[in-house]
Amino acid sequence: MNQRLQRLGDQIQRELAVLIRDDVNDPRLTGFVTISSVKVSSDLGYADVYVTIMEPELNDAMSKHSHEESLKVLNKAAGFLRTELSHSLKTRTTPRLRFHYDEVTARGNYMMDLINKAVTKTEQTSADDDADRLDSEDRS
């Protein structure tokens, strides 16, 4: 991706974050939407917007199916968002927006949770071993 497309993608990412937060008032959009990245096609026809959605009532961050409703809302609002985006972009055409669930970020969060659990378990095991060693030294 050349530098111009990268800059345009970054600008779209910033603008969309504000637009989604302030102007999309659909009650079906229950989670906190974060835009991970935007990839603009070389002909400026499309912009693939990768999002993660943190649902407050869901514990499973890896559940892609739980976010399908929010993605439907975003894809339905894509025309409105494109129109609003056209007011701030300095391009002749505004790319069509396609929203996708960013599985890379979700998988990374899931892996961090697993690592944190393993570290906590290791620390507990180490503390238990130290307590057992001190207890056996006291008996001697």
Swiss-Prot record:
Single biological process term from Gene Ontology: maturation of SSU-rRNA
Keyword Cytoplasm: yes
Function: One of several proteins that assist in the late maturation steps of the functional core of the 30S ribosomal subunit. Associates with free 30S ribosomal subunits (but not with 30S subunits that are part of 70S ribosomes or polysomes). Required for efficient processing of 16S rRNA. May interact with the 5'-terminal helix region of 16S rRNA.
Family matches, as Pfam families: RBFA
GO cellular component: cytosol
Disordered: annotated span: 121-140
Main location: cytoplasm
Single GO term (MF): ribosomal small subunit binding
InterPro entries, per database record: KH_dom-like_a/b, RbfA, RbfA_dom_sf
Protein's UniProt name: Ribosome-binding factor A
PANTHER family given in the database record: RIBOSOME-BINDING FACTOR A, CHLOROPLASTIC-RELATED
